[in-house]
Structure formats: structure tokens, C-alpha cells
Amino acid sequence: MNISSFSDNLTKILGKYEDLSEKLSSGIGGEEFVKASKEYADLEDIVQKIKEYNKAKAELEEANNFKQEPSLDKATLEMIEEEIRNLEDSLPTLERSVKIALLPKDEADSKSAIIEIRAGTGGEEAALFAAKLFNMYQRYAELKGWRFEILSIDETGIGGYKEVSASIKGKDVFSKLKFESGVHRVQRVPETESQGRIHTSAATVAVLPEVEDVDIKLEEKDLRIDTYRASGAGGQHVNTTDSAVRITHIPTGITVALQDEKSQHKNKAKALKILRARIYEEERRKKDQERANNRRKQIGSGDRSERIRTYNFPQGRVSDHRINLTLYKIDEVINGQLDEFIEALIANDEAKKLSDI
């Protein structure tokens, strides 16, 4: 984006903001008022950043002009030169802030999320690691004040999880957690290891935006719903009614099975919630892939097939391989203190997008 088009863009945004302000003050009502109010609210953040940027630019121009005054004494000149240096230092940061606010928004960022964790290679140790990851995200949600609800859980005999999913509700949850999708690897000495050897195992994390009926319409004709008796460990039936539910979305082949609740109705409701999220994410993935093909580049660092992070317990370190960030704070991270990684991943994503402008 060249300087002229960047400046023109800012002028247009400020103009639109003023027009919306006048429109809202003119006494409009109904749907027109709702639409204008939303547009106005959506622009408030970027307008505030543009005004700060324009103010700094104007102050810099004024200071440079004042510096040319022949009657200035030495002390005043030094004061002006210091002000110019400070303004010149702040402008790139303010400009970057504006450009980031101008980046196309991911429509899913404001949504709540569904997180799914599956034990990967490593047997029982992988299942224990999956449980530890699940607890880590649950703790992170608590620290953020988000609502955390377990949707389904498939436990092993010694406290591990073969597979587990949860709904995390709150503002901008998906924007924070979307970069957690991928293969997480752990290196540690299992409690059952008598020789003290380090084992490596893995778990897969998938983060999906939680969607409502308005986002994904599920037609009855597109769904195949099977019911069956819930079974426990070893395959024995734990319920005398057909409370377990399996729903298949015929057009995509996506299937969700749930048996956690004793009520078939509750299992169906939870299964539909997960199904909507998976279909929505599949549509997002296809759109991302189309954009990637158009630009002849790979999009998205959340590819679930790639190893994204390693948790090394003997060394007390956690390494994110996408951004080459290593923190020697494994206890804090496992206890839900993820912001340092999450903020770095968001900044990395913004930098990539800015380089494409």
C-alpha cells in the first residue's frame, strides 16, 4: 500500500464515520438505526487509532516548522528537537497500529470456541498428556473469565483421555485460541518408567469457532441420526435406553457421536453443536485454501498435521516451533499461563498479513 492510497483510505474511513454519526443523530429508526449503529461501533477502534496517528503527524509538522524560526534561543531549540525525536519515534508504532486495524477481520474471531483434544502416538502416556493439555486450557479459560463446559470425554483407566471436547464461551475466544490447533508433543519420564528414560508422545488439538443456527443451517434431510445404547469401559452397556447419538451430515460425511449424557435429547443437542462447528470450520478451511491457491502461498499456521509445540519436562521448557519461541516456564504454561505464546502468535500472524499488503 503506497503512502497516497494509505492516506486516502484513512480519509475515507473518517468521512464514513462522520456520516454515520450524523445519520444516527438525525433520528432514524428500525433496521436502519441498528445497521448504522453496528457500522459506527465497528469503526470506533480504527477511527481512534487514525486520530492519534494524524495528531502525531500534525504535531511533528508543526514542530519542524517552529524549528525554522530564527529567533529561537538554544534551550527552546533543544526542547523542540527532543519533541521531534519523540514524535518520529512514535509515528512508526502508530502507523503500524492503524495498518493492523485495517487488516481484513476474521469473521470467526469474535466467536466462542469448541476445543477437541485427541491422544496421538504414545499410548497411555499420550492419553495422560491429552488430559494435561485439556486441564491447561480449562485453567486458561478460568483465568480469562470464560465459561468452560465439557461436551464429551473418553477416559482411560488411569486418568488419561483418549478424546475430549469442550465449549469455551466468551468474547473473542476463537481469536485467542485458534493458533492452538495442531500437534502438541511432550517429552518426559512417565511415572511407570523404571529406567528413567524420556518418552515422546503427542496429542492433537483442534479449535473450532462455535456457531449458531444462523451461521450454519442444518436441514433435517441432510442428517442421518442413529441412536444406540451407551457403553462404558470394556464395551459393557451402561444404559438400558438408546441414549447415545450418532449424527452424520450426509453432504460432507462429517460424523459426531456422543454418549456422555443419560438423556438422548441432551446428547443430540451437544452433538449438533459440535457438528455445526466442524462443518463451519471445514467451509472456512476450503475458503482459506482457495485464497492460498490464488496467492500461490500456504495460508494458516494452524495446520493440524504439523507439530506446533513441544513440552519438555526434564528441561522445564516449552518451545513453539512456528515462531521459534522457547520459554523455560513449563509449570506456569501447563497451569494455564498461555498469554505469552498466544500474544506472540497473534503478532506473528499480523506481521505476515502486513507483509502481504
Swiss-Prot record:
Q: How is it modified after translation?
A: Methylated by PrmC. Methylation increases the termination efficiency of RF1.
**What gene does the UniProt entry assign to this protein?**
prfA
Q: Would you indicate the residue range of the signal peptide? A: none
In Swiss-Prot or TrEMBL terms, this protein is called: Peptide chain release factor 1
Q: Which Pfam families match?
A: PCRF, RF-1
A single cellular component GO annotation? cytoplasm
Role description? Peptide chain release factor 1 directs the termination of translation in response to the peptide chain termination codons UAG and UAA.
Q: Where is the composition biased (Basic and acidic residues)?
A: 284-293
Q: Which organism is it from?
A: Rickettsia bellii (strain RML369-C)
List the keywords (alphabetical): Cytoplasm, Methylation, Protein biosynthesis
Renumbered residue ranges of the record's region Disordered: 284-313
Q: Which residues carry this modification: N5-methylglutamine?
A: Q236
Gene3D superfamilies (UniProt xref): 3.30.160.20, 3.30.70.1660, 6.10.140.1950
PROSITE patterns, per database record: RF_PROK_I
Q: Where in the cell is it found?
A: Cytoplasm
Q: Which InterPro entries match?
A: PCRF, Pep_chain_release_fac_I, Pep_chain_release_fac_I_sf, Prokaryotic/Mito_RF, RF-1
Q: SMART domains per the record?
A: PCRF (SM00937)
Q: Name one GO molecular function term.
A: translation release factor activity, codon specific
